[in-house]
């Protein structure tokens, strides 16, 4: 059946393909499990405010973007959200869209919003009239093919991976009789008759479906969301291709495949769904605009965030118990800004007044592509927004290291061959019968969590091509300035990357360092330590005004965020003169780990005391070995003195920054355009996985199966799941992550911040549309000014509401 009527103009190919491109870019990318990183699920909607994005995603995904109103009502009743917070959020909302009076807003809080429903696809309409779950059938057949096509080494017999996605799918679909058995006669033939070129196929399907120009983008977006993580994985391929100046058509190929299914269903069910389909097209063609209900929800969300901001401000201005000794520090230790470091840093500093800690992006400013010992795989250990500029490998280029590298490669090949033998279709049966008893001891050891996993300890990294002195010097100067570490060096300076230590966890890489692209951060830290210990670099640093004392030694370390153990790579730069310093540092780190584990045990289910935590890392059945970044609420770029000693409960990204040392505000620009953006991706992934877990969450860990080595499905099939598992945001009884958009606090002149936002419209959009909140701190560390959008600021509320807020618990 052809839905086009003589009076309905067919969109031009350019209009049609541009709509397909916009829909593709509205989908967030999904990184494979080997290097999974947090991704902002609203990446395609940051150019519009929350209320408008809620309207858009309700149409295309049938999801809310805020919590149920009862969640806000409970907090209003308890005083956690004060009436003043609600009033301030109400007054900041656009007058034309908000409720007419504050009283009407308060009444709206007591009534639950309507259940969100997506505009139907033809598969939805066919299900309703035929009683057959066509959306499930479509998703099942596409997933069955996609899990093989996108496979990255898990399948022993991968098939159909040659060529573009659309072409590969046509080869499989023309021989798949499942749709015809389900009742869609002639489907295989219709696929064979479809144009061989994906763009031509899109044009043909749009004509058959009778779509008008205004409906295209929303309809295309809707179809891509029905494919779950598969469309996000395809979007990742486009993202990666564009980093190197190329392109990839996988996501539009998936759209083409989904359109062919829609056209086939129209051919079958057109006469009985014609009226409903025309109504759906009209709904897709409607402009996206926020409804009054969307605006109410956005106001409630902002009120909750204002309440959290007040608690944060009260914490920062409270009396700090921190003791800071005058003179040269006894120990300096730089950590990643990751919120998990906040607990450990506070514990470490409490042990001695001479200990100073710093916060900096965990890749330490080194965008490297690293090849591990005995491997040819290049790991991009840097933020996913960037591409590697330096390539490194493990071990010096000596005969002994080369021989060890070769031996490691041979061992790895033998292990891979043995693994494939164990899993092969025929030999697997004989293997279990013959060799099963040999594995009893290993099974018991691993099952009981008796095996301990050592920290990564490859030979020290080195650039594959030697870096000249100017390059090394430039790196050292820029990184030390970015860390605000240009004077007052201790005898021992530790550079601590971080990683996780878990077993039986497909999402293990998501617990590693996001700034290192989902890998642990020790490689970057070890490389930076070697640069900063270089005598030639030290000499030239002095000429640049950065005087590093002769007796200062930089060493790398790795903070295990699961167990709070810290491993120092002292052998990289062995120094007899610093042996006692290293020993003392190890004692302090051990004590800090005990304190940090004790604090973390209070939040972890079934962890009664700190010593329970290390076993959780080795427990096959443990769903929550750590909370990762759950609870993240703030990003603070300021001198450590502003936050030292204040209990931020592991909820804040802490980046050391002193604007007085930042000539030209280049470091400030770097912070706003890199770490802040990465932190926003993390915060919004947790937000999306909490408020809309069905679409932006990975589902139930108990049901996860890895497919293709790239992602997880629930059970034995279905759509690829993206985002965070439910157990990462919920403890089984209540949410452990409070869904709040990140508050960014920066101690710097407002004019400098505004100039940077003006130069970076994509970053500015995050603040203008309130995907992030922005505050400027004054010289006393107070949240003095709030960014209100359009490069404007307002003075924050002072003490006039202190009585009302005093009823609330200060974090």
Swiss-Prot record:
**Which terms in the Gene Ontology molecular function aspect does this entry carry?**
zinc ion binding
Protein localization: Cell inner membrane
Q: Which GO terms describe its cellular component?
A: plasma membrane
* Keyword vocabulary terms for this entry: Cell inner membrane, Cell membrane, Membrane, Metal-binding, Transport, Zinc
Q: Where does Zn(2+) bind?
A: 336, 338, 498, 513
Q: Which cofactor does it need?
A: Zn(2+)
> What membrane topology is annotated for this entry?
Peripheral membrane protein
Its biological purpose is as follows:
Part of an energy-coupled inorganic carbon pump.
Family to which the UniProt record says this protein belongs: Belongs to the inorganic carbon transporter (TC 9.A.2) DabA family.
> Which PANTHER family does its entry note?
INORGANIC CARBON TRANSPORTER SUBUNIT DABA-RELATED, UPF0753 PROTEIN AQ_863
> Whom does it interact with, and what assembly results?
Forms a complex with DabB.
Name listed for the protein in its UniProt record: Probable inorganic carbon transporter subunit DabA
Which organism is this entry from? Azorhizobium caulinodans (strain ATCC 43989 / DSM 5975 / JCM 20966 / LMG 6465 / NBRC 14845 / NCIMB 13405 / ORS 571)
The lineage is: Bacteria, Pseudomonadati, Pseudomonadota, Alphaproteobacteria, Hyphomicrobiales
